[in-house]
Amino acid sequence: MIPGMLDEVLDVLEREGISYTLIEYPEKNRKSIDIIARGKQRRFVIKISNDRPSKEETRDLKNFSAVVGSMPVMVTDDTEEDIAIGKDNVIGLSVEGLAKALRGEKIFIYRTRGGIFIKIRSDVLRRKRTEMNYSMGDLSKILGVTRKTIYDYENGESDVSIEVAEKLIDLFGDEVIGDVCDDALPKLEPDSQPTDTISSRIAKNLTDAGFASAPIRFTAVDVVASRGLKKVLVTVEPKNQDQLEKKLREASKIANELMSELVIVVKSASMAKRLDKDGFKILTSESIDSLSDEINRSD
């Protein structure tokens, strides 16, 4: 993360009056989440990066966002104000683009390796075409594309070039133009961690209990889970005890921002007793198979 870019993002959040939480763990290692912010229309999970993030960091960002129902955003200086970068179900935005998204303004131009495209609203396109009595063949001739391409447009399987977008606006008005943020909620990716890790075992336990759940590697929580309106975060006691206080503080910030239940998994009864006095919900590592039962009892 670049300190200067972080300052710019924080300035935007303050200027726009956005409620946000800055995540400051881990401090020196790779980090998948920098900020969680509540925009005008949706919650954003934000990573600030000028370097290309690793696949693991990106997977973390996507899976965390998928489970808590938020939009993952990578803030980068690799794009212009009004152009998003679309890759692997994560939207890349400039600082200015993030400000627009936070305000709920449309961002409809995006760039991939395949070129620059305009996001369209497939349902509006289909409705407008039907209302104006255009067949797919009629519209394909007007736009200079195939009938199959029209079918793809109307089923949300393809967006359009700038040239085609201009023709669609002339025909149907700018209502047909979409917003890249509207379809930015990702799907869970499979866990790539060894299945014998504590976090993977916890995630599997919660998945078996009917939660959407994923282990998370590069932030203050190690497992994120949700079922209906209920969200659960699990933080595992770190190996380095010098990091414990910081990790728990940052995990608590995330839990408060998401209004979720936080469970701390510890290795010893003495640590459990110590943290229980501080008001944390505690489970020992030997008892993690009963985690879902503990959560159900708290409902």
From Swiss-Prot:
DNA-binding region ranges: 136-155
Keywords, alphabetical: DNA-binding, Transcription, Transcription regulation
Keyword DNA-binding among record annotations: yes
HTH cro/C1-type domain residues: 125-180
SMART domains xrefs: HTH_XRE (SM00530)
GO MF term set: DNA binding; DNA-binding transcription factor activity
Listed InterPro entries: Arc_TR_HTH, Cro/C1-type_HTH, Lambda_DNA-bd_dom_sf
Superkingdom field: Archaea
HAMAP family found in the cross-reference section: HTH_type_cro_C1
Name of the protein this chain belongs to: Putative HTH-type transcriptional regulatory protein Msed_1725
